[in-house]
Swiss-Prot record:
InterPro entries: AAA+_ATPase, ABC2_TM, ABC_transporter-like_ATP-bd, ABC_transporter-like_CS, ABCG_transporters, EGF-like_dom, P-loop_NTPase. Residues 759-768, 775-784, 822-841 have a biased composition (Low complexity). One of its GO terms (molecular function) is ATP hydrolysis activity. This is ABC transporter G family member 24. The lineage of its organism: Eukaryota, Amoebozoa, Evosea, Eumycetozoa, Dictyostelia.
Amino acid sequence: MIIFKNNEIRFNSILKSILLLLLLFINGNNCKTAQQFLDENFNHALFREHQLEKEYKTKQLVKDDPNMYSDWTEVPAATAEAVTIMRGDDYYYDYDKEQKIEMIVFGSENAISSGSAQNYWYGQTCEATNFNNTPTTTCPNDCHSYWGQGQCNETSSTCICNYFFIGDDCSENVDPQHNWDKMNCNGGRYCPPIYNYPTPRSCVCPPGQAGLECTVCLNNEGCQALTGNYSSSFECNSSPYTYFEKSYSCVVTSAEVNGDLNNSTASASIDCQFPGGNYNTQTGVCSMNLYYRIHGSPLYFNCSFTECDRTILPGQNQSIVCQNSVCNCTTYCGFILDGLISAVTGEATFECGAQTNPDGTSNCLFSQYTINQMLPAIPLQCMSGECIDVATGAPTPPPIYPVPVASMSFLYIYVGSGVGFIGLTLLIGAIFLIFSLQEDRKNFKEDTHLVCELSFHNISCYVNERSGFFGKDVKRKQILDNVNGVCPPGQLTALMGLSGSGKTSLLDILSGRKNVGNIDGKVLINGAPVGKNFKRISGYVTQDDIQIGTLTCREHLMFAALLKLPENMSLEIKQQRVASVLEELGLTRVADNPIGTSEKRGISGGERRRLSIATELIVDPSILFIDEPTSGLDSHSASELITKLKQLANNSTKGQRTIIFSIHQPSAELFEQFDNLILLHQGNPYFSGKREDSVNYFIKQKIAGMTEFEQQNYRMHLKNPADFIISMVTDKNCQRFNSTYVDSRVASPFYQSTSPALSSNSNNSDINLNHHRIINNPHNQNIHHQQHHHHHRHIYGINGPSIDNNDSDSDSDERDHLLASDNINNNNNNNKVKNNDNNNKNNDDDVEDIEEASPIIVVGNQGEPLASHIKIGKVEEYATSFWTQFFVVCRRSLLNYMRNPFLLRTTYFVHIFVGLTLGYLFWKLPANLEPGCQNRFGAMFFMTALLSFGSITSLDLFYNDRIIFIRERANGFYRTSAYFLAKVVTDIIPMRVIPPIILGSICYYMIGLRPGILHFIYFLISLVLTSTVASSMCMAISTISPTFGTANMVSILLLFVFLLFDGFLLARSSIPKYLIGLVWISFMSYGLEIPVVNEFNGLWIEYNPPNTRPTYADGLEFLSTIGANPNRLFTDMYVLLGMIVGYLLLAYVFLRFLVREYR
């Protein structure tokens, strides 16, 4: 044995020298690290040498007699143990118990007290009946002989250790990895494993003691062992209140903390000391050891707290608040977490409930200011014990909290019940109110078809045109100038004129759509001003036929019927109305054909035009406005359409309709079908009256001065009256004939009055046709006139004699037919005329200079007034409720998605493909720093960027359908809010919710992200929220952008800025302070932080740098390096939800107030 010891010393010296030289050669610039590495490897080498020695002895025993140990009867225990380990047997023979012992570890995993558990370890049982391991007189050290770790050599007074332990007292395990985290068992037995078996370490406590470190008393006998005083004056107090020195042994029940420890249930030992039993005055100190496993070792970190005070909370719960905190990590923490734990300062709080659980434990809560920045308050389940010397006086009991528990509970119950009752009452009341309003709407009987006469008086309109680079030059442009007229029901009224004459502007003003420019004048319906309900009794067909091309004609009209017909009308009646309109406009043959898109041809142009008219006829409007109904149609289609319109005006089953339309230069066939004509040129009215009178009016101007033969010849060759009328207006010589006509009109029998009202109003008033307005009002036939003396006029550069007509009969004859507008100053011509007419003998000889004016003469019979004027009853602005409009628009949008599935299919295919690709590239990432953490972070960044940029497709949502929305909203189809909500819902659910879920579901487990259903759900929520925020932002941009290119450019620019400041490409610590606001407004920073925190907060990361022993770091350390806050998981979700609401609200405001057709 002496020879062996000498060889051992020689071997150790040689080995240590070789390792030292090798390390110095490899890393000569870092001697300290090399020395540490040498010490660690030397201990391993020593352990290996110890193994070789045991193996040598075992082989020698087996060599002497191979069959000697087959029945395990005579082999010494130490030798048998060594043989068992070397042979790999599952048991060994214990000679003291004379039985075979299985080499397993078992016991109650959830037991806080290890005193009652039987924990076995490889090679030696921890079960003990005698805990008196005191040194003997011959051996100054214990040698842990009872435990079989060593025995005292009385000759040398030293301990001789067995094969598994070393040290002066044989307390150190031969494997150094099992010594640094050795627990202080306070008289109990510490059970470490041997060799490299990953078995639990724990304290086996003596009778009467319990807890992780055997510091909790179970009874009075335990107090005697703990205090070393075997008198009977010590009593064990198991309440959660701390009097002098209380010990708590706790199990951590926090899922987050245990998740950080690789889902191992952590434990904590807490001790608090106070100098006296006075509960209210003295301050004390506390300490805490946080262990990795439920039964203790290894130690994670420990903390000391000072300036601690005890208080009693409601419910008699105890709270210990300490002002100062100091914490230290063990080597188990890792480098990064060591720095974080060492920085712990500030207040710490330890609270325990007065009520105990059935197993005798209490529910407690530990929180610390610095730790709370990374983790919330840590819930604990603790057993407690304190040994109190009653001989020195009983401690002061804790005070009673002022508010009794029962009273507080009843107060909560009363308040909660009251609030709940009030809330329930309000909810029921709101539901009842909404239901009542809906029933009132459904039961409301609207008026039948209204026969309406439309009249307009003194309609003028001008706009300010800006020019120049900066638009500073403003020029006023006259669009309409004092236009008057009457449109009777049952007739076609045509607004005719060349392009730019003001036809569409007048049509827009009459229909209430004109929203640009300054407008003067009055528009009356049956003598009453136009109200908000005008949309319900009128329809407007624009020049452009814009419909959803994927729908059929019947579907298009059915959606219009569902939106514009009353809700009390049954679905069957609405379907009959659709079929009737289709038949009325000759669309039955193509009723089930698609309308057609730019990619796929559908119905013809004429059929589309008739479909646009049919859309407005669904509600049987009293007044129908049509802008250029024959535009783009051939002569046959145009004639057929005008014929249909004439039938609709005069042959309605519910009453006559008033139809007003604009037209350029119709054919003779079309012109003959008009009932009334309003002629405009350059904004000025030239005629307003019956269509047949217009031809005679302009012919008499044309043939004035011709011989009778020339007049007959001219009438014979007149082919198209419309062409003739337009040519008369544009002819430079027209004013010469107009002047002649005005001079001779009094004697013409064509202008004899047929109105008794006007005839009875005959008087001797003088009328100047150029300076006065005679309005044929169908309701009172009042004539406004004024006498002017010695007025002269200049017509397009032609001077004519002034008119001084004193014949009252002539005046009365003309009042029924002439509609003259006021004299308007022409600012473009400043010629002034001085006319000395010697024939005006009844007037003064004074001569007045006047500004040049156009001859505004509007002539014709405006039709007899209605015998009885039908008043417009109570008609609501919209025929259907908000929810009806919402569901109908939702259904139409979804149907459009199904009929045009390319975008939907492409989106789903891309997300499935990307999910599989990411799963393949990042397959089962390991839980290490590189590539595990790097690739996890990269995969999350890629998904965030993909979903954000993929949401640019939302730009089409409101931009492509903008014209349809403007037209339908203007026609009273729906509210802006109902349309907006329907479009948002039908876009977000199929395009922003389902695709991210598909993407995340495919790649989550393929990548190997954190297991657990909650973590998976949080991950999907982050993807959905990110996609929805990006989509909402694009919606807001598209609603306000004038062009699609502008919306696209702004969206991409913002997405790139947000991508740069999301925390992946640019570290937050390196962002300048004046740009840090971009981080807070970047939705990607929140969208990326959620999955990162969800993944790394609780992930145990292996750090394995080259040439060093691998260590483990908490995921919190990684989060701190990238600037992520682990406590912002739910806060980030709330922020993203707020951004969604904010962007959508902004988009709605833009859509409601800024998106409109400027006419």
